[in-house]
Amino acid sequence: MSTQKISFYNLAWRWHFYAGLFVAPFMVLLALTGIIYLFKPQLDPLMYGDLLTVPAAEHALSADEQLQRAKAAYPRGTLSKYLPPADATSSAQFVMHDGGREMTVFVDPYRGTVLGTQDAKNNLQAIARALHGELMIGTVGDRLIELAAGWGVMLVISGVYLWWPRGKSSSGVLWPRFTTRGRVFWRDLHAVTGFWGAALLLVMLLSGMAWTGFWGKQYAELWNRFPAAMWNTVPTSDQQARVLNTATQQTVPWAMENTPMPVSGDHAEHMNHGAMHAAPAAPTIRLQQVVDLATARKVEPGYSITPPTTAEGVFTVAVFANDPRNDATLHVDQYTGKVLADVRWEHYNGVARATETGVMLHEGKMFGWVNQLIVLLICLMILLSAVSGVVIWWKRRPAGGLGVPPLRHDLPKWKTAMVIMLGLAIIFPLVGASLIVVWALDRLLLSRLFAQPSRV
């Protein structure tokens, strides 16, 4: 192996170490919370079956009658979302704000019985989703997750380079050498697991980044475009549909997040863009009319209805379907019942379709239990890689030292590294900025602070 190859190997190893040091805790958290959310379809019926299922009957109450039953039980509650029964044995769900709390009220759609409530933000799935998306600390958490995902991409790329056989036998490359012990065994386990999971992990990282607040938003603004003519005849506000999505609840599909929210009725003519009236709306059409409209438009069951909260607001019917080809987002005038926008899969451009498909694969929903098992396997491989990586580091680190891989003095002016850093900075600006910071710390501080021999 030439001096330059040896030098770049050490450089890749050093950056792989730094990436792993930062990424590993986040990857463990993302894998664990991802597993919880992955099995939501199985866990929810087991944990909340008494709230979610009802005996089927011949006649159901209207959506407005169901809402009245929910309000009678919780008169201070203000409706923020309605989820009609997805099938004949499902309860109706009303997400309501009550005294500062956001809770879901479950109603038997046939008998009008209030089955119970659930804190909409303080249940297993909501907590797992909030941790997975923003660590439950808002924007700062979102940026940290984005950084971790970006560094994860670098971790995978550098890991594949370090794994590359370079004339070695398949043993320890394509499968671990189970006859070995100690650090060599853990290194084999780490390298082989990382190799087999590399491509799938990249798909998971990149599809997940589509939801991040900084990179994901810029990505959507750049690539996710609808024909301007779709909105030319519709009065719109300065708000985008992304306001309907929260850390704990998904309402509209990713493809709709950067689309404008239409406004209702005569208020559209007098609206001051960017300033929405604070007073709640008093819609003239009934909730059942919106349900009937969704049925007539063949919206797939499992959709939600978000009512207007202002005099200019609209009803939004949205389904974030397991198969994105069944996605639908409808905005309905609260006064006339006119459909102001009806956006489906066929309206998405190629990038939006690819991203929506990636998101559904990411969440394990696209191909049923097969998709779930594949994502579960990826999560388990992430956990195994993280644990084995920590064990390798622990076994090779010198006493009292950090164990940073040695930096050779014959590196060729960091040219290759600078090209990689520049590429990552362009694709992932936050990652690029953090790379510069870590590079400076490594050159000016860490390389001197921990300058001691290290076993390869």
Regions found by a protein language model. Give the residues of each.
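Conserved histidines in hydrophobic membrane contexts and catalytic metal-binding motifs
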Residues: 1-456
